Amino acid sequence: MTQKIKIQTAKVLVIDDEPEITDIVETFLTEAGYLVNVENSSRNAAAKARQFKPDVVLLDIMMPDMDGYQTCQAIKQDPELANVPIIFLTGKDRTDDMGRSFKVGGDMFIKKPFSCERLLEIINLVIMSTYKH
């Protein structure tokens, strides 16, 4: 049975080591009505996801401890989190990076810099398609 959630109360976990990015995204999404939690360490990301139980994850690829691909795999290996959509946020835009992000379980790929409005559109689209609104 597919769970239905309201977009306005969806929980978003932002995993990025750049405070200027996380601050902007957290503020914008909170003002849009989302419940937002931030994790700056990729090593702690899977544990934070298990604790927070997000409806969607925003994940940077270039992180210092583990890259976003490894982090995505760690999250997807958890049975409780396996179906949570992951949107990669990255400064990388090579075709092989995009392909690899999908191969490890990512659902979308957004290149930095991005507009908050576009990010919101993509989050809404992913939530609607995942949770069958």
Question: Which stretches of residues belong to each language-model region?
Answer:
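Charged docking surfaces used in two-component/phosphorelay signaling
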Residues: D23-E31
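Short hydrophobic/Thr-rich beta-strand motif most characteristic of the beta2 strand and flanking loop
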Residues: G33-N40, K48
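Active-site beta3 strand of CheY-like receiver
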Residues: F52-L58
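Receiver (REC) domain active-site loop signature in two-component systems and cognate sites
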Residues: M63
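C-terminal output helix
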Residues: F114-N124
